[in-house]
Structure formats: C-alpha cells, structure tokens
C-alpha cells in the first residue's frame, strides 16, 4: 500500500498541500479548558511540505469557530456537519501559531474496514470488530490490515485521510487532508487461516516489525448494547473497558499463535507489550497492543 498527499486544487497555491485540524466539541479536551472563552472550537490550518527527504506539517494560522451559514441557509453554531464552508470575512485568523514547530507527517486513512452483519445501516463513527473508524496512524504505507469478513462481498470501505495524528486523536481530529492511496485486497478463506491469523475476530495490523492488536470499549457494540447500540455507545465507552478488551485479545493471541501458557502470556505482556490509547473521540474508544516480532526470533516462524 502507498499513501501520498494530493496537491491543492486552487491555482493560487499550485504545488502546495494543506490540511486542517479541528479542536471540536467531541474532543476529549472540550470540557476541560483553562483559558477563555470556554467552551470553544478552534481550527488550525497546516501546510504539508513533501519536497524533502523528511516531510513535515507546519501551522499557517488558526481561528475560532463562529456560527457559519451553509449554502442551504442552515446556521451551524458548532462544527456539527462535515464540509461546512467557512466565511473568512467573519473569522479572526491568528497567524502567530506554533511558530518554529514542524510535525513529521504520517499519512494514513483513519477509516478502513468491512461491513458488519448486525445492521444494514451503521453509524460510520464508532469502530468495532469490522474495523472502520479506528484512527490508528500506524495503518500507513507498507502496512497490512486483516479484517474478519462478516457479510457477502466484504464491502470494504475507506476514507478519513490524515496527514498526521498522535495516539488518542485527543482534540477530535487529525490533520485532515486529501490523500491518494494504493491498496491490494486479498481474501483469505477462514479454513486456511493459521499462525497469527488463526481464529481472528478483530482488526489486526501487521508491519515488518510488529503486530498491533486493536481493543475497543465494546468488541462488538452492535451486538452487546442491543437495539439502541448506535446511540448508547457514545455514553458507555471507557478506557478501562478498551484496555480490558485489548488485554484479552493479546492474551489469546500469545497463547494460541505462540503456544504460551496463560502465565507466560501475562508476564510477557507486562514486560514486552506496549499498550496505547488509539483514540478517545470515536464513540467506541480504542486501545492498541503492540508486540515486536523480534521477541520470537528464536521460535519457528508463524
């Protein structure tokens, strides 16, 4: 897989690429601000420089969100709908922002996954066993993702392209920008799955050096939370639940694919597995567990 930023379509900025980060109302920070006005939403515009050996994002300006009227006459007091055009004559641009700070870009797609079997129409925000809006920046160039297929045809979808994001996506978004991706799709029949893919029931990321398992507050929220799951998931998620799910998945992974006892698996998790917060902004919160392949260099390849 390859991922590349797209150049700006505005001829005034030919050859340049830009992205935006919205510190929005659904962000983890929103109700815990220090300075006035509180609450507030802030958009920061970044220029993406891909001209050198190391590619960077650098802030150009930011502005506080003020009510915006869309082309249909609807007033948006908050960032409640994607793609609302911003009238720059009524916002105050601050060009003195993040001076001399350059962020290495990590282009990736926040949404990649297949369709679940539990519902015909599914909210695209919460991720689950089928993948979806996982927002893991490690799913970039050269990565391999495995998803359990739940419906005929799989119905793979992709979107939510990011130039850079940290673990947690804390303020609600990454640097959102247009990307061009190249993908290869391979169907693995369930009865042929062995090694690290045996019995896979969740999204698994494989890189050259690591396996990354994905845990969620609810491993299958559509089944676990009942008829109102797509509403209830936003109020019932927690980091504790997501960590518990990631722990359980990694325990089984080590016991079944590496032949460890439960006691061995638990010890290894504590000393050799990195658990991290994938995201806390997508309804079904995520914890990832990273284990390096080099730990098993003395074992037969699986």
Regions found by a protein language model. Give the residues of each.
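Short beta-strand elements
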Residues: 1, 185-187, 289-291
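General structural feature for long, well-ordered alpha-helical segments within catalytic domains
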Residues: 135-141, 181, 239-242, 246-250, ...
